[in-house]
């Protein structure tokens, strides 16, 4: 008979790997909070900035336009510099961009900030690598499920909390700016907390990095066609 499997120690924060899991899903949560902070505030932003319907629709495209290529780029950076530094820098950078979006005075400024904020969607790949470094094979599935599931909840919290912050807490014409700017400040502060409390691997383990980046070799026309199709989303 097989020994009974121990329950996943989700709240055993005295264990280093569990602490890292909570720090990591919260980082992912904050990236989604930033990424979707503007969605429920678009009616207020539209009125305040005198935007047209076409301009509002443009934000929907700009919000995700950079995400796919950014995930590839961030993945390369994670391999080279490690998830701890990569996540900390991404949080700080996107926090600054979020404040820039909140302070924008023209549609063009809003559009540029919104486009660049698509970087936040790349945070997902960082946490996947970090969690896999900290958890054994028998636990990595549930750990990554918690990371992804709880982190994604940031989008729902953004939808609920942003109008409350903008209207009830801050109020006035610039309430939406203060609400969105606050999420940027939170991200910047958390980037420091994350960097100071997380390591790439458990104590004594080695973080393996690629020895050298090289081009992907293809040897047949069929492989070349497959490679082109695989990369089409980057340019669409």
Pin down the residues of each PLM region:
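MFS-fold secondary transporters
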Residues: 97-101, 117, 194
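Helix-loop-helix hairpin linking two adjacent transmembrane segments in secondary transporters
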Residues: 147-200
């Amino acid at each position: 008979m097989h020994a009974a499997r121990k329950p996943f120690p989700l709240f055993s924060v005295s264990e280093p790997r569990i602490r890292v899991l909570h720090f990591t899903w919260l980082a992912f949560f904050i990236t989604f909070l930033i990424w979707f902070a503007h969605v429920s505030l678009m009616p207020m932003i539209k009125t305040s900035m005198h935007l047209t319907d076409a301009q509002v629709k443009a934000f929907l495209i700009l919000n995700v336009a950079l995400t796919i290529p950014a995930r590839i780029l961030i993945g390369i950076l994670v391999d080279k510099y490690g998830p701890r530094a990569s996540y900390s820098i991404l949080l700080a950078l996107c926090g600054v961009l979020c404040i820039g979006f909140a302070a924008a005075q023209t549609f063009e400024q809003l559009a540029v900030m919104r486009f660049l904020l698509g970087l936040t969607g790349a945070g997902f790949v960082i946490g996947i690598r970090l969690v896999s470094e900290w958890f054994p094979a028998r636990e990595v599935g549930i750990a990554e499920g918690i990371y992804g599931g709880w982190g994604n909840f940031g989008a729902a919290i953004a939808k609920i909390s942003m109008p409350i912050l903008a209207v009830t807490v801050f109020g006035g014409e610039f309430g939406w700016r203060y609400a969105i700017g606050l999420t940027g400040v939170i991200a910047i502060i958390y980037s420091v907390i994350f960097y100071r409390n997380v390591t790439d691997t458990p104590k004594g383990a080695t973080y393996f990095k690629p020895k050298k980046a090289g081009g992907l070799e293809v040897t047949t026309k069929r492989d070349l066609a497959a490679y082109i199709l695989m990369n089409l989303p980057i340019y669409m």
